[in-house]
Amino acid sequence: MGLNLTLTKLPGNELYSQASHTANSTSEGHGKNSTLHNKFDTIILPVLYLVIFVASILLNGLAVWIFFHIRNKTSFIFYLKNIVVADLIMTLTFPFRIVRDAGFGPWYFEFILCRYTSVLFYANMYTSIVFLGLISVDRYLKVVKPFGDSRMYSITFTKVLSVCVWVIMAILSLPNIILTNGQPTKENIHDCMKLKSPLGAKWHMAVTYVDSCLFVAVLVILIGCYIAISRYIHKSSRQFISQSSRKRKHNQSIRVVVAVFFTCFLPYHLCRIPFTFSNLDRLLDESAHKILYYCKEMTLFLSACNVCLDPIIYFFMCKSFSRRLFKKSNIRTRSESIRSLQSVRRSEVRIYYDYTDV
């Protein structure tokens, strides 16, 4: 599911495809370009991934702690908990990339990344994408179709649907692990596709197409839900002013989801999808491949940044989460401060009247 800049194709599941090492070998002797490329691979990328690794551990660790104290009252909260799990698993793959890119691992360390780590990274990235789509559908149903089929709103249905998502992603991912069974050597270790069996290579490409279609489907759902909610709120705000403020908050919530989705996932797929469904890579020269490699790595980094941006969704969209966070931090929300001030004033009034009645 990553770009492989040995590029015969834009394959899917190689997060740690050996584009950097292939590009290094082809760029040797090119002076400044080679030095810049080496610094990008061995210094800049490891530092960037180290930063988001530390940030993600802190943010998602806090999220796990808070969600542990929140009951599964709604399907929305349950979807958020699934995203936390996916983000944490995805985060745990970062150290492997950092070690590889910084040059600290042995040569056969590449095999671990090809067979396990890259598969886990992409499986959990697309799991997060699916749950973001489910959250947008949940917001649409709660705002536009609040009196629809009751089974769609039950927590049992949500749990079953969530299990189905994890099972499907496991079914797509496990063959990529099992069929990456080639004998690693110093000659083939830098190309993950050479470590796959013939069936593994075909499965890998099939999963690449499935994931690309999955992204497009979720993108369409997100945009469709956002437009539908916006239109409904605009239409109903003229009739029911008291209810529209609450529904406007739902609209702001889905805006956060759309913003995170577009920021993290759209750039990478704009870079990847044209190559997945065409033979554009055959038309590119070496300099174009190098530019594509930099674009791929930076847009892939943006996708990885999703693990740090998802906590923003928890904070702005989940009242239970923000309330629990403020409570644990001894910080009052604005509404709580107003209620507390009103309570104090009422107490002062009662004391005044009690005193004057004496």
UniProtKB/Swiss-Prot annotation:
It comes from the Eukaryota. Residues 1-47, 97-116, 181-208, 278-297 are extracellular. Disulfide bonds join 114-192. The chain crosses the membrane at residues 48-68, 76-96, 117-137, 160-180, 209-229, 257-277, 298-318. Pfam families: 7tm_1 (PF00001). GO terms for cellular component: plasma membrane. GO terms for molecular function: G protein-coupled purinergic nucleotide receptor activity. It is a multi-pass membrane protein. Its main location: membrane. Residues 69-75, 138-159, 230-256, 319-358 are cytoplasmic. Keywords: Cell membrane, Disulfide bond, G-protein coupled receptor, Glycoprotein, Membrane, Receptor, Transducer, Transmembrane, Transmembrane helix. Disruption phenotype: Tubule-specific Gpr87 deletion in mice ameliorates tubulointerstitial fibrosis induced by unilateral ureteral obstruction. Glycans are attached at residues 4, 24, 33. SUPFAM superfamilies: Family A G protein-coupled receptor-like. It is found in: Cell membrane. Expressed at high levels in testis and brain and to a lesser extent placenta, ovary, prostate, and skeletal muscle but not in heart, lung, kidney, liver or intestine. Receptor for lysophosphatidic acid (LPA). Necessary for p53/TP53-dependent survival in response to DNA damage. Promotes the Hippo-YAP signaling pathway and thereby modulates glycolysis and oxidative stress production by the regulation of hexokinase-2/HK2. Belongs to the G-protein coupled receptor 1 family. This is G-protein coupled receptor 87. It comes from Mus musculus (Mouse). The gene is Gpr87.
